[in-house]
Amino acid sequence: MAKKRVVIGMSGGVDSSVSAWLLKEQGYEVIGLFMKNWEDDDDSEYCSTRQDWIDAASVADVVGVDIEAVNFAAEYKDRVFAEFLREYEAGRTPNPDVLCNAEIKFKAFLDHAMLLGADMIATGHYARVREVTSGPDAGQVQLLKAVDASKDQSYFLHRLNQAQLSKTLFPLGEIRKTEVRKIAEQLQLPNASKKDSTGICFIGERPFREFLNRYLSYQPGPMKTPDGTIVGEHVGLSFYTLGQRKGIGLGGMKTHKNTDGNSGPWYVARKDVANNTLYIVQGHDHPWLLSSALSAGQMSWVAGRAPSEELVAAKTRYRQADVACSQHATADNLALAFDTPQWAVTPGQSAVLYQGDVCLGGGIITASTLTE
């Protein structure tokens, strides 16, 4: 019987490298695919594409798999980056990794892999897939959290559909990150000690405000407290996100006390796009930073349909602990009420629902309801 062919995305990082080795050990025919998805500034000091390709090719040689490079820069710019900029211009804070996974890593990449005769694709994400074997959902594929809760990436994968998940393997889903590092060291992979990437999907770890400034027009405006007092000037609403503390530029006013009695560090609490006004508050637990409910749109449900109205858990940001909530979901919209108020619920970010370890899907936060 011919081996199943798996095309794996190899980024030059440790996770995808160890994933390639694991797949080969499991008896698959493995082909590596390195994706180049950004080329606006290949010569920038922040662009690591060349080194990443060298690392990926070196690992492929050690592991014993073929590897090729493919350029998805045009697809990334059209499907991900353009939407990323539109969201920032609208005053929201998007998560490009969510859209990149759905549109590039599991769509453009999947399509290319099929042209290479792949039976399955694989990535180095920390998540799991499981086929339902009985009951009314028999044959459905579920997206589950990774065993290593500290590295779980199901939040970023919640927009994947049945067609995508049914063709996907996550070799690291049952493995802890510490074990991945050990395997890389034992294999003497050339990137065994390489740091994990923490930058924007495919764009890297460059200064974010400087990067946005190249693509967005901006207009300075007033920075106000809830009582309407002007305490400074913002450089442009696109450069701020709810809950932000650093980079506001009011470090010398920490002891200032507002009429509401709050004092302490300043946080971004609200963006009034219509009036180009940034509202800031003092104190981590200021009421303007706490939300009891949210609304979301652009829903994507893993099972292809909205979950029934029952108690679930939600995440409104990566690595947040699951939060108990009640919800009413349709194919297109979500209304969610938290059991306990949540901090800095941010329009543009994703609200993702879970039933235990099972990721149900989610959508883009459009608004939140303050506790006061």
From Swiss-Prot:
Signal peptide: none annotated. The record marks H125, Q349 as: Interaction with tRNA. Its EC number is 2.8.1.13. GO terms for cellular component: cytoplasm. Keywords: ATP-binding, Cytoplasm, Disulfide bond, Nucleotide-binding, RNA-binding, Transferase, tRNA processing, tRNA-binding. It is found in: Cytoplasm. Residues 151-153, 317-318 are annotated as: Interaction with tRNA. ATP binds at G9, M10, S11, G12, G13, V14, D15, S16, M35, G124. SUPFAM superfamilies: Adenine nucleotide alpha hydrolases-like (SSF52402). Coiled coil: none annotated. GO terms for biological process: tRNA wobble position uridine thiolation. Its main location: cytoplasm. The keyword ATP-binding applies. Disulfide bonds join C100-C201. InterPro entries: MnmA-like, MnmA-like_C, MnmA-like_central, MnmA-like_central_sf, Rossmann-like_a/b/a_fold. NCBIfam families: PRK00143.1, trmU. PANTHER family: MITOCHONDRIAL TRNA-SPECIFIC 2-THIOURIDYLASE 1, TRNA 5-METHYLAMINOMETHYL-2-THIOURIDYLATE -METHYLTRANSFERASE. Belongs to the MnmA/TRMU family. This is tRNA-specific 2-thiouridylase MnmA. It comes from Herminiimonas arsenicoxydans.
